[in-house]
């Protein structure tokens, strides 16, 4: 416990909050170009082939982003929009690709939760 004199001499320092998505540079989304599209396997109790892409952002960072939904049309040089949000069972994947914008098409035949996958309302 500091004395009043110690507090006068040097005030209490604020605790700095560390961002979980530094590559976005305080923006809600960032545009980028896919440099590599591939599949990877998740951490231990889970088993799958998760679709991910290595993306070079306009902020200068190169990050790994998850491609949500079933099926995608992304390949090298595709222009995509990135949002924050990690994938719990993929270490190092801290970003999501937004479906239905730029070169990433929406998920086909999606009926529920369409807004998250960029799918238009079926007629």
UniProtKB/Swiss-Prot annotation:
Pfam families: Ribosom_S12_S23. Gene3D superfamilies: Nucleic acid-binding proteins. Residues 113-123 have a biased composition (Basic residues). GO terms for cellular component: small ribosomal subunit. Residues 1-28, 104-123 are annotated as: Disordered. Keywords: Methylation, Ribonucleoprotein, Ribosomal protein, RNA-binding, rRNA-binding, tRNA-binding. GO terms for molecular function: rRNA binding; structural constituent of ribosome; tRNA binding. GO terms for biological process: translation. The keyword Nucleus does not apply. The modification 3-methylthioaspartic acid is found at residue 89. The keyword ATP-binding does not apply. Part of the 30S ribosomal subunit. Contacts proteins S8 and S17. May interact with IF1 in the 30S initiation complex. PANTHER family: 30S RIBOSOMAL PROTEIN S12 FAMILY MEMBER. Belongs to the universal ribosomal protein uS12 family. With S4 and S5 plays an important role in translational accuracy. This is Small ribosomal subunit protein uS12. The lineage of its organism: Bacteria, Bacillati, Cyanobacteriota, Cyanophyceae, Oscillatoriophycideae. The gene is rpsL.
